[in-house]
Amino acid sequence: IDLTSPDTTVALLELDAVIGLRGTVEAVNGRKTLTRVGVTCALCHSTVDDSFAPGIGKRLDGWPNRDLNPGAIIALSPALDAGTRSVFNSWGKGKYDPRFNLDGINGPQVIPPAYGLAGVARITTTGDGDEIAYWNRYVAVTQMGGHGSFSDSRTGVDVRNGTDDLVTSRLPALQAYQLTLAAPTPPAGS
């Protein structure tokens, strides 16, 4: 299998075999074509155990994807000026700045795990919210452009995308799932 072929990528997306990406594949002029793509939380908060080959294996939900370089991906946008592109490229693998698009201050942090959070107070990496749902809403609306709203007078953030709300109804189930993700057993001697 040629993993560098766009046709392979389309086939994997059609099979829902790419962690963190969801695609709609349709026949266009007799050829399978990716007509829509979306990003899920798993892009940053799941990885694989490399049991088959590097980057291929059993899915590990809640584990931070420290191989992912979100800044380099975002920097590919033709809408960015050179200075902003440079900031995104400075982050490196496994890091992300969830506030940069709002405050313009370059402050990347290591992508945190989404496991072992049951019973943790001030559960978000920034300490802003008490529940994971706070952060899930923040990321869904302010980072991923999800249809809904996020507002916090303490931080001055008030973002509304669209007139419908496709975020709120999904938050309870997502939070419940995240709270079931136990932290892995530490390696011996660590």
List each language-model region with its residue ranges:
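Periplasmic c-type cytochrome electron-transfer domains
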Residues: 1-190
